[in-house]
Every structure is written in C-alpha cells, then in structure tokens.
A protein has these predicted regions:
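Alpha-helix-loop-beta-strand connector modules within alpha/beta enzyme cores
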Residues: 1, 28-54, 85-99
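Glycine-rich phosphate-binding active-site loops on the catalytic face of alpha/beta enzymes
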Residues: 9, 21-29, 63-87
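Generic, ordered loop/turn and secondary-structure boundary motif
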Residues: 4-5, 53, 75-76
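Active-site beta->alpha loop and helix N-cap motifs at the rims of alpha/beta catalytic domains
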Residues: 1-3, 8-24
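Catalytic cores of alpha/beta
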Residues: 7-15, 38, 42, 46, ...
Length: 99
C-alpha cells in the first residue's frame, strides 16, 4: 500500500512509518509533492511508485523525491533475464544522471 493524501501521510507517520511510498505517483504529480513536502517532516524519505521512470526521474528529484519503485517499466511477464538486466542497467544509469 501507499499514500496519496496528507491525511494518509500523517496516519502512516503516526503509525511509525520511517518513509512514505506514494502510489500511484502519477496521480500526485510533482507540484503536489512540493506542496506536501511543505508540511511533512523534512527528514521523511519519499518514494515514488507508479508512473515514474527514466523520463521523469529528474523532475521528481527536483520536487523532493528520495527514491523510486519501478515495476512494469522493469519487468513484464515472459521477458528474459537478459532483457530485464539491460532495462535495469538503463534505469540505474538514468537515475544516476538525474541526481
């Protein structure tokens, strides 16, 4: 499970979360993440999952994302380990370049 709303964020924090997974991040958008960061604890790691990837790592990082979860952008049923490995290398390179 993940969070989207400020209420969900603070409920998770109240329950002891030491990081927040925003899912699906594509519904939040970078501008809303910037707004949420204004009220969240400054040391809270924020992970974006769903609708994120190499094409938008940079804009999410600028908005305050700490990290990302990649699902279907990395693996689709039936793909060989070789294909997944090449995708993973490409994703890591894009992340490193976005830093």
């Amino acid at each position: 499970p993940g969070v989207i709303t400020p209420t969900e964020c603070f409920s998770a924090i109240h329950c002891g979360a030491d990081g927040l997974k925003f899912f699906p991040a594509s519904l939040i958008g970078e501008d809303n993440l910037i707004a949420l960061k204004a009220v969240l604890p400054s040391d809270m790691p924020l992970f974006m999952v769903g609708g994120v990837g190499p094409k938008n790592f940079s804009s999410w990082i600028k908005a305050g994302a700490t990290g990302f979860g990649i699902g279907s952008g990395l693996y689709k049923a039936g793909e060989s380990p070789n294909i997944v490995s090449k995708k993973a290398e490409s994703i890591v390179l894009a992340y490193d370049e976005a830093q």
